[in-house]
């Protein structure tokens, strides 16, 4: 009798755990607008092509890695102006966007590093349809920054 009771309690706890896990996974589903930010992008800076960045998800957060350096750079160039763990790291392959979290229909709360000057900025990211992405980097408040529009690479 006692063994059956324990088995029943274990089944109830296991069922609760599975249900809670499924509920948590469903809660982390991203809207299509947020999902559109994941992909392969041509960076456009001052109306000129400026390298490629792949954006991807890790733990529900958006990150971005340089997959092609800007014109005039070589794949062996490093970020000599960066600080911390990015100091003297190859620009090609560098994770320049980190820890962007969903905030309504945008990604916010993350940081972006400009490998040209080594500076780190707060950032916001939103999509303009499926094939354009806007990245706003700023210091302090969003008004003190600038926005780049990136174009999806098929």
Residue ranges of predicted features:
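Generic beta-strand structural signal
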Residues: 57, 102, 127-128, 152
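Central antiparallel beta-sheet cores of small beta-barrel/beta-sandwich binding domains
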Residues: 38, 43-45, 49-116, 120-121
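Edge beta-strand at a domain terminus
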Residues: 130-132, 139-154
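N-terminal helix-cap/turn-to-beta initiation motif at the start of protein domains
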Residues: 28-40
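Bacterial N-terminal signal peptides
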Residues: 11-21
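Acidic, glycine-rich flexible loop segments
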Residues: 112-131, 136
């Amino acid at each position: 009798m006692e063994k059956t009771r324990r088995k029943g309690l274990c089944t109830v706890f296991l069922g609760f755990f599975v249900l809670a896990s499924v509920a948590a996974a469903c809660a982390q589903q991203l809207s299509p607008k947020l999902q559109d930010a994941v992909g392969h992008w041509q960076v456009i800076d001052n109306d000129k092509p400026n390298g490629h960045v792949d954006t991807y998800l890790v733990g529900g957060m958006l990150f971005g890695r340089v997959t092609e350096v800007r014109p005039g750079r070589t794949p062996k160039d490093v970020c000599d102006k960066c600080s911390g763990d990015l100091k003297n790291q190859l620009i090609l392959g560098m994770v320049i966007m980190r820890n962007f979290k969903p905030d309504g229909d945008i990604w916010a709360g993350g940081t972006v590093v400009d490998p040209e000057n080594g500076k780190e900025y707060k950032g916001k990211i939103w999509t303009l349809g499926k094939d354009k992405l806007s990245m706003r980097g700023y210091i302090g408040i969003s008004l003190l920054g600038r926005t780049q529009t990136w174009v999806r690479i098929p």
